[in-house]
Amino acid sequence: MRTTSFFLLTILCLALTASAQIYSEGPIDGNNNAFFVTGPAFPNFLGSVQDISNGFVAANSGSPGGLEWGEWSVGAPTSFSYELGSAAFGNDIGSATVGQNAFNSVFLFTNGFGYGVYDVAVPISSSVMTAGSTYWLSISNATDAANDGTQGWDIPNGGSGGPAICNVRQSGTNFGACIEDGVILGGESFTISNSIPPYTPEPSSILLFGSGILGLAGILRRKLNIQV
C-alpha cells in the first residue's frame, strides 16, 4: 500500500508541475544566435533600434506568474521590459519594466562570441491565458549598467528558433517575420508559467550549463543578429 500511495503521489506531483507551465519555447541555447532587444528605448551597438515579439499558442490555461527567458549581454544586465498582448508588440494583456540582478538573472557561461549568457526568471502579472489561444510576448528595452547595446534574446535549437512566430520591430515599425540569410527563424528561448520565481530549473536548463561550457571548445557559427 505504501508503494502504491507513493506512486500515486509522484504522478500527482508531475501533473501539477506540467499544468503550471502555460507555454515553453524550449531551453536556452546560448551558443548560436540571438536577436537584439534594446529598442525602442535604446539603440544597439550597431546603431539600430530593434526589439522582438513572439506569437505562441498557450498549451495550458492560467494566470501567468513567471517569465523565464535566455539573454545575451556583454555586461551584467540591469533591466528589460516585457509586453504580453493579443497582437505582435501589443501590451493589452500585461506589461512591465523589470530590474535585473544576480538573483533573477543567473549567469550561465560566456559563449564563443564573448557574450555572457543569462537565465532570466522574473515574476509577471497579466490577464488569464486560455489554452489554444494565441498570445504575443515581446522583449524590449534591455540594457546593462554601461548601456553598451549588446543585449539579445537567445534563439534556441541551434539558432533556428522554436515553433513560435518571430516578428522584428525596427524604430517602432513591425517588419514582420524574423529572417536571416533568406531563412525565416522561429521563436526565442522563453517559458511562461503559473509559478512565481524563484522556482526549480528544468532538467534541460541544468544540463545546458554543462553543454554550454563544452561548446566553447568549438567554432560557433553565428553572432548576435540584426535585421536589415
Name each region found by the language model.
Residues 58-66, 77:
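Extended extracellular/luminal ectodomain segments enriched in beta-structured repeat modules
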Residues 23, 33, 52-54, 75-76, ...:
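PGST-rich, cysteine-poor low-complexity/disordered linker and tail segments that act as flexible spacers
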Residues 19-40:
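Boundary/junction segments of secreted and surface-exposed precursor proteins
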Residues 46-57, 120:
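Short beta-strands within extracellular/lumenal beta-sheet-rich domains
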Residues 1-24, 190-211:
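Short, threonine-centered small-residue motifs that mark membrane-proximal processing/anchoring sites
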Residues 37-50, 110-115:
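Extracellular beta-rich ligand/substrate-recognition surface
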Residues 73-164, 168-170:
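Aromatic- and Gly/Pro-enriched, solvent-exposed loop/edge beta-strand patches characteristic
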Residues 217-228:
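C-terminal membrane-anchoring or membrane-association module
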